[in-house]
């Protein structure tokens, strides 16, 4: 898997974006071809699909965690399906406590704390496992652009700062698909990390299905210490902003590619950087789960989703799903 950082031209067009545009047109054509040839299957339970239109972190995992807690509180049985990014997974697997991030993906390890999780890279492979578990609801994390299965309820997650970047498809821009079609079809749209009352113009036609959401810390961290932050996630800037808003003194930071698999040498380098800054290492939960076997002493910031219209979410989820 090719892992890229989020380049500046994905947010603001420059000559590089325009030079890559012909490749984006090929990407668009292949996407249309794939969708036109696909014969979507019906999965053996109602499907809630959580996805986004662009590359990079938009808060999907936190939305899935929120949904899992919501369904559990209603005694609704569910299974989470995750895409196993950054793993060496060969076939669909039901995650158990002993699985590592390298085996099933960092998101799978985290989500397994909230309920039954199937990690897969091929959506069709989950059917036998779903039949064994017999859930009422299947929460699919990502796969929004996958045309090979029917979706009963879709949630599109949008980062309030990046929105849809420069408006170009991969690789000239961050888009997996142009947003209008996805937003029109969505049952709900989450505008994540939004602390502003003003709705971005591109989202004003969808105000009736728009939910403002914030990523907020859910654990206590000593604010008297110095911290050196690092992450290998899709939107590291939001993580660093969350740390500062939480009141931590961040003396430095280092960014790794999304879903990065850390080596012992990386850990040693990070400890060296922290020592230079007279600081303690702090990272995300997605990164922290990858260090289980490396005997580390790294602080982890846990986060959760806070939304402004929980009643709207409850009404739509339980009315349709």
From Swiss-Prot:
GO terms for molecular function: ATP binding; tetraacyldisaccharide 4'-kinase activity. Keywords: ATP-binding, Kinase, Lipid A biosynthesis, Lipid biosynthesis, Lipid metabolism, Nucleotide-binding, Transferase. Pathway: Glycolipid biosynthesis; lipid IV(A) biosynthesis; lipid IV(A) from (3R)-3-hydroxytetradecanoyl-[acyl-carrier-protein] and UDP-N-acetyl-alpha-D-glucosamine: step 6/6. It comes from the Bacteria. One of its GO terms (biological process) is lipopolysaccharide core region biosynthetic process. One of its GO terms (cellular component) is plasma membrane. Its EC number is 2.7.1.130. The keyword Secreted does not apply. The keyword ATP-binding applies. ATP binds at residues 54-61. Pfam families: LpxK. It catalyses: a lipid A disaccharide + ATP = a lipid IVA + ADP + H(+). Transfers the gamma-phosphate of ATP to the 4'-position of a tetraacyldisaccharide 1-phosphate intermediate (termed DS-1-P) to form tetraacyldisaccharide 1,4'-bis-phosphate (lipid IVA). Belongs to the LpxK family. This is Tetraacyldisaccharide 4'-kinase.
